[in-house]
From Swiss-Prot:
SMART domains: Knot1. Keywords: Disulfide bond, Ion channel impairing toxin, Neurotoxin, Secreted, Toxin, Voltage-gated sodium channel impairing toxin. Disulfide bonds join 12-65, 16-41, 25-46, 29-48. GO terms for molecular function: sodium channel inhibitor activity; toxin activity. It comes from Centruroides baergi. This is Beta-toxin Cb2. GO terms for biological process: defense response; envenomation resulting in negative regulation of voltage-gated sodium channel activity in another organism. The keyword Phosphoprotein does not apply. Belongs to the long (4 C-C) scorpion toxin superfamily. Sodium channel inhibitor family. Beta subfamily.
Length: 66
């Protein structure tokens, strides 16, 4: 599974600059999911890959970014 890293409290994507490989996104994806996850900056949001199927990604059901 893959998808945008989401803040569970606000419902917003984690934003980033520096499109493509991005140390911030790699670190945040691994902190949220696990060490084998990877992340990069895509369309100014952290996109995480190699996630487990139950991983929660953006958009959250019934919660809009404020």
């Amino acid at each position: 599974k893959e998808g945008y890293l989401v803040d569970l409290h606000t419902g917003c994507k984690y934003t980033c600059v520096g499109l493509g490989d991005n140390d911030y996104c790699v670190r945040e994806c691994r902190l949220r999911y696990y060490d084998s996850a990877h992340g990069y900056c895509y369309a100014f949001g952290c996109w995480c890959t190699h996630l487990y199927e139950q991983a929660v990604v953006w958009p959250l059901p019934n919660k809009r970014c404020k």
